[in-house]
A protein has these predicted regions:
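Short linear sequence motif anchored by a di-proline
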Residues: 1-229
Length: 229
């Protein structure tokens, strides 16, 4: 399960790989409830105006905050959504039902490697140097603050048999990985109806990824965002 990653904040890389502009005020190191960019299909794409782009980047809290949640802190436990149960869980089922698909641009993600007997923060990224496009769901909430707050979650799948992700988390735990999309899937995912959503829940090949231990990541001080509620 991914609770920490580095967002794509470089304007040129966001434009080149995701065809969107970077939202203002975004930091690179992301933890639950931090604001980070996510990409969604432009809501006015189908109005017939060719000037409307296919995608837009939004700033949202990492951790889906459903419309009925009364506190932003709800997102501390909803930063990942299991693809096997996403249609049933109250936190996610509305976003899944209405196919509120998004892509989370990430330079790399972090997972704990327990093979030495203790957790070693490990950076995982694409071998070709391109950023990851992680499949997610987005939502909006007005109840918590009275103002519209956007948020998102990353979708995950089983990785017990994945040559790379099977190495992470405690030995007795189920192995999970985020759903990393190919570039040629981006628009298909953003526009897919709910009936086709499961087709995208596939493992990204281990041969196209690299990992490296980053022990300092675990010792770095981070400032937790303070939710308004």
């Amino acid at each position: 399960m991914c609770s920490n990653y580095d967002a794509v904040t470089n304007a040129e890389r966001l434009r080149l790989y995701f065809d969107v502009d970077v939202p203002a005020g975004i930091k690179s190191q992301i933890w639950p409830l931090y604001e980070a960019p996510f990409t969604r299909r432009h809501p006015n794409k189908d109005v017939g105006d060719e000037a409307v782009p296919a995608r837009e980047a939004m700033a949202g809290r990492f951790g889906l905050i459903p419309h009925w949640a009364g506190e932003l802190s709800f997102g501390r436990r909803t930063y990942n959504a299991r693809s096997e149960t996403v249609a049933e869980k109250p936190s996610f089922r509305d976003a899944w039902k209405h196919a509120r698909h998004c892509i989370v641009p990430a330079e790399w993600i972090y997972e704990p490697d327990w093979r030495t007997g203790k957790a070693v923060p490990t950076r995982i990224q694409r071998k070709d140097g391109k950023p990851m496009g992680i499949a997610g769901l987005w939502g909006s909430n007005r109840k918590a603050t009275g103002e519209e707050v956007f948020s998102f979650t990353m979708l995950t799948i089983n990785a017990d048999d994945h040559d790379l992700f099977k190495n992470f988390h405690k030995p007795q735990d189920e192995k999970r990985m985020v759903v990393i999309l190919r570039e040629d899937q981006y628009d298909d995912w953003l526009g897919a109806p709910v009936g086709l959503s499961p087709d995208f829940m596939r493992q990204y090949p281990a041969r196209l990824l690299i990992d490296a231990a980053d022990p300092e990541r675990g010792s770095k001080t981070r400032t937790n965002p303070t939710p308004n509620n």
